[in-house]
């Protein structure tokens, strides 16, 4: 079986328990977290659980930032794996991983589980300092994020180079596309991160 460069990167990142992001994307995420730390305890919501859930929770803890992350995942086996790793890392008090199980597809969310996934931050009845959109139904999740984001809060959209996700972006008062770099030299795909906010006009400070 032929293994491509990205396959090798995915396997290596999994071995290291690092998020599937470019190095530049991780640094942008870290700068956003540090820029928000004055609002402790940070309330964070994440669409799509993974090694990023674990990695950035460890990052915050290593800097003595008080926080709580709510993360929702649609794949039960992956959810259980990440939940186990979070427990092993001693992060069970800081990270809550929710499951809303459904089979992935291309259609808009329709089933109760799919709608529950999109509306999870609303159902929690709170507003968030940071909402990370990196899972299923990203357009719908961006729209849902608007109603549960604190005025100075930030939405972080991964894979923002995909124009299919751009529909709701204009509804945010402030926004910034940031170069996310590449996974490897000469990679044809140019990765981007998008940051959006209702009332935070300093998003370009995170370009770095």
Show the residue positions of the predicted features.
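A short alpha-helical cap/connector motif
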Residues: 1-130, 136-150, 154, 160-208
């Amino acid at each position: 079986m032929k293994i491509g460069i990205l396959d090798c990167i995915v396997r290596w990142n999994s071995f290291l328990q690092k998020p599937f992001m470019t190095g530049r994307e991780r640094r942008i995420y870290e700068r956003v977290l540090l820029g928000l730390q004055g609002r402790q305890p940070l309330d964070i919501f994440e669409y799509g659980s993974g090694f990023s859930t674990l990695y950035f929770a460890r990052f915050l803890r290593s800097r003595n930032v008080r926080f709580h992350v709510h993360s929702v995942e649609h794949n039960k086996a992956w959810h259980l794996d990440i939940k186990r790793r979070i427990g092993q890392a001693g992060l069970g008090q800081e990270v809550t991983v929710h499951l809303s199980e459904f089979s992935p597809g291309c259609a808009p969310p329709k089933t109760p589980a799919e709608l529950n996934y999109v509306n999870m931050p609303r159902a929690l009845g709170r507003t968030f300092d940071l909402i990370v959109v990196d899972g299923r139904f990203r357009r719908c999740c961006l729209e849902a994020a608007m109603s549960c984001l604190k005025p100075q809060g930030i939405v972080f959209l991964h894979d923002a180079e995909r124009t299919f996700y751009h529909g709701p972006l204009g509804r945010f008062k402030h926004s910034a596309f940031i170069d996310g770099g590449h996974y490897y030299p000469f990679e044809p795909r140019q990765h981007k991160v998008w940051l959006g906010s209702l009332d935070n006009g300093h998003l370009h400070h995170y370009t770095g």
